[in-house]
């Protein structure tokens, strides 16, 4: 294993530039965390007057942006914090990072000269104040581009055709529709822009003192890249804006080297001049690295404000639901992502109505009810749902004659369940939906393993339900900040690939010592009884039938 070892006494620095904060994580050569810091935008940079890191435009429904310079100043502040922690920057062999997906930055004509001649005696903020043609960056929360989405889909032959090429149908938050909106409505700004970066490639650009390429994984979140060819799609570019490819620059693999660290950081913070900057990527791809998802059959379920399912596959089949990105840690693999808007807030709503606003009572009710919930199926949409595309509403059904087989199953709609059934209904309903949609994307049944993360992954009752429904072991991780941890891991991986002169599987770095690293995870729930798993499969099929009917009757585009 020596040939895959990292240099002793070296560090690897990972960042996560997210919606609400900038995080930094430092790993040593054994992949153990030695330092971490956090800048919270609202509280640490209050003069920007953001709320949750963003501006919501009251005059333009759905327009949500963040001040670009806030991200720059956050980096200045982060380095002040890291310096005070006595981190020896000269030991850092590589830097990489994570950026909130889909967000975009617009560099004004002439800004490349500013980037390449940064004065180490001045903070970045002071030097980049006039570098951007748009001061406020559109971000993933923005939903003001519905017209642009439909126009792009129509131009390429429909939503399914766009999904087959780019990995996703057009979504309002994706970068392509956001660029089209600027091109159509603010042509003078578009024409005064020499480079369009994602948040990830924008931050990487600061570190190399030049425009960094967009990586394949994050580039797939734009509705602009051909995911099979890993190149810009001509038809998608033409459907979006004129002269777009020249403004986007090149694409690069996530494990590639963006460049050596800029002299600014060498002179100001005493980085080694040979420190590598590995391509930055999106937050979700970095989480895949931080959760050690790297082989087909691996699945992660993130249970947070929104719920997300990640899976690894070699043979993706993009459709009208979900997203497909090239894997950031596997040269031939892909990651599939399924997003649910109704996550912890919807579970909390059921808790508040049925469990005395107490998670202890909620868990007690969940444990008191039998698996399969006596054939009761619930659909809980406190918010407009993405997957499936359904409006706000709760729908409840009781399956009659349920014996564990699909034959003879008939459902009856009811107005309400008793509190214990409602509690189990909201948990099982979401997990059955996840299993059904993941299997459509080619997830093996059962998966090899599931890694659960997010706030609700601390709930053992929910973990047991995951194991029972999916039929595999469920693991949990030491730390919840998987994006910044994943970025530091990717920094080490990129350094190793560069040393070897080409791609190496990321697992080579930790396969014999994973349990001794900050990446280790623990078994939290064992695979469910296979007879029960089969019964869940049957009721899942019935649930899918009902879901399809609801979409036909109530579904949104």
Locations of regions flagged by a protein language model:
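Glycine/Thr-rich phosphate-binding loops that ligate phosphate moieties of nucleotide
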Residues: 1-51, 57, 61-62, 69-76, ...
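Conserved phosphate-binding catalytic cores of ATP/NTP-utilizing and phosphoryl-transfer enzymes
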Residues: 2-7, 260-271, 281-298
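Gly/Ser/Thr-rich active-site cleft segment
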Residues: 17-19, 141-143, 153-282, 378
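A short, N-terminal amphipathic alpha-helix
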Residues: 77-86
């Amino acid at each position: 294993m020596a040939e895959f070892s990292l240099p002793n006494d070296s560090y690897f620095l990972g960042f996560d530039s997210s919606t609400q904060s900038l995080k930094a994580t430092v790993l040593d050569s054994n992949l153990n965390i030695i330092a971490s810091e956090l800048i919270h935008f609202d509280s640490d940079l209050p003069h920007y007057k953001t709320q949750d890191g963003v501006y919501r435009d009251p005059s333009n429904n759905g327009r949500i942006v963040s001040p670009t310079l806030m991200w720059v100043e956050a980096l200045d502040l982060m380095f002040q914090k890291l310096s005070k922690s006595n981190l020896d920057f000269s030991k850092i062999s590589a830097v990489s990072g994570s950026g909130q997906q889909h967000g975009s930055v617009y560099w004004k004509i002439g800004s490349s000269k500013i980037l390449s001649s940064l004065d180490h005696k001045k903070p970045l903020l002071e030097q980049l104040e006039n570098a951007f043609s748009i001061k406020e960056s559109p971000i993933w929360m923005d939903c003001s581009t519905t017209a642009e989405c439909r126009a792009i889909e129509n131009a390429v032959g429909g939503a399914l055709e766009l999904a087959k090429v780019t990995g996703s149908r057009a979504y309002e938050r994706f970068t392509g529709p956001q660029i089209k909106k600027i091109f159509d409505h603010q042509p003078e700004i578009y024409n005064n822009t020499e480079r369009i970066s994602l948040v990830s490639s924008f931050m990487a650009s600061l570190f190399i003192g030049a425009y960094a390429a967009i990586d394949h994984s994050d580039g797939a979140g734009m509705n602009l890249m051909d995911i099979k060819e890993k190149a810009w799609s001509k038809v998608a570019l033409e459907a979006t804006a004129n002269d777009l490819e020249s403004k986007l620059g090149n694409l690069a693999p996530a494990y590639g080297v963006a460049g050596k660290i800029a002299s600014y950081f060498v002179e100001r913070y005493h980085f080694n001049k040979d420190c590598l900057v590995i391509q930055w990527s999106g937050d979700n791809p970095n989480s895949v690295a931080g959760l050690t998802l790297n082989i087909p059959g691996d699945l992660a379920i993130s249970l947070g404000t929104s719920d997300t399912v990640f899976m690894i596959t070699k043979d993706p089949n993009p459709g009208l639901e979900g997203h497909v990105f090239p894997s950031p840690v596997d040269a031939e693999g892909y990651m599939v992502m399924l997003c649910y808007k109704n996550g912890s807030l919807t579970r909390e709503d059921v808790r508040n109505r049925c469990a005395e606003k107490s998670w202890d009572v909620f868990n007690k009710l969940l444990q008191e009810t039998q698996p399969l919930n006596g054939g009761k199926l619930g659909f809980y949409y406190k918010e407009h749902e993405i997957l499936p595309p359904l409006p706000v509403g709760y729908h409840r059904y009781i399956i009659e004659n349920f014996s564990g087989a699909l034959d003879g199953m008939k459902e009856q709609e009811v107005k309400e369940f008793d509190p214990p059934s409602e509690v189990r209904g909201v948990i099982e309903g979401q997990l059955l939906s996840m299993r059904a949609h993941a299997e459509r994307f080619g997830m093996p049944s059962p998966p090899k393993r599931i890694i659960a993360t997010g706030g609700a992954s601390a709930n053992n009752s929910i973990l047991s339900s995951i194991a029972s429904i999916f039929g595999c072991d469920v693991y949990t991780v030491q730390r919840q900040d998987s994006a910044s941890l994943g970025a530091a891991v990717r920094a080490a991986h990129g350094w190793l690939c560069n040393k070897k002169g080409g791609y190496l599987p990321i697992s080579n770095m930790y396969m014999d010592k994973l349990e001794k690293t900050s990446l280790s995870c623990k078994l939290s729930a064992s695979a469910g009884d296979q007879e029960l798993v089969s019964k869940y499969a049957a009721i899942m099929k019935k649930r899918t039938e009902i879901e399809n009917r609801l979409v036909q009757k109530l579904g949104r585009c």
